[in-house]
Design a protein with these regions (language model features):
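Contiguous surface segments at macromolecular interaction interfaces
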Residues: 1-31, 111-198
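Short N-terminal edge-element motif at the start of the domain
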Residues: 20-89
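Short beta-strand-centered aromatic/proline hotspots
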Residues: 95, 99-110
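A general structural signal for short secondary-structure junctions and capping/turn motifs
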Residues: 14-15, 69-74, 92-96, 130-131
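Eukaryotic short linear interaction motifs
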Residues: 88-90, 109-114
């Protein structure tokens, strides 16, 4: 995908801890690989731009998942791990499994609430942005790495239990991986080809 250079003036350098927060993202059912729902097949309307591979941002292009991203930044996680339950075209054994198919290292942050409210005011017939009722809307910027469907890290209930975590591998799962667990996931994904440019 073609890269978009954004003006980083006004962005703040970010110093996070060596931790990765899991963030569920909607993916396309019409794609052979887990990519963002650009066609709005899930009828959410908000997922069309996030994560934004082209600008290496999350939350800058659209006001989506604001509370979760704000919480990740407040908790000082250095990484966002993108998870999904893939339901696309491929008839693989991985279909309907919970996959971590990419990550983002947060290098910079910016409060973009005013930006999103101004976009809404310019087009008031659109849906009210999630950030309208919030004090802040933090967008994040940094390098991203996404892998193919077959190269994704499979997160299972059994693995979570083995690692000492409670919960099920589902869209509601809010978990922070640290130290060896985070390293294992990042090393696994880094060992696979980068698919952003495909």
């Amino acid at each position: 995908m073609p890269k978009i250079d954004i003006n980083l003036e006004g962005w703040q350098d970010y110093r996070g801890m060596n931790a990765g927060s899991l963030l569920y993202v909607e993916t396309s059912r019409e794609a052979a690989v887990p990519v963002r729902d650009q066609l709005n097949e899930n009828e959410k309307g908000l997922y069309l731009y996030e994560p934004n591979y082209e600008s290496s941002t999350y939350g800058f292009m659209s006001c989506y998942n604001v509370k979760n991203v704000n919480a990740i930044v407040k908790a000082k996680s250095r990484y966002i791990l993108f998870g999904t339950r893939y339901e696309g075209l491929s008839e693989s054994d991985l279909k309907n499994k919970y996959l971590i198919h990419g990550y983002m290292r947060i290098d910079k942050t910016r409060d973009v609430r005013t930006r999103h409210i101004q976009k809404f005011m310019a087009n008031p017939t659109s849906a009210e942005p999630e950030c309208m009722q919030l004090e802040k809307n933090i967008a994040v910027y940094g390098p991203m790495h996404f892998v193919s469907f077959e190269d994704s890290f499979v997160l299972t209930d059994e693995l979570l239990k083995e690692w000492g975590y409670k919960g099920h591998a589902s869209r509601q799962l809010k978990i922070v991986f640290k130290d060896d667990r985070l390293k294992m996931i990042l090393d696994f994904l880094d060992s696979k080809p980068q698919m952003i440019d495909e």
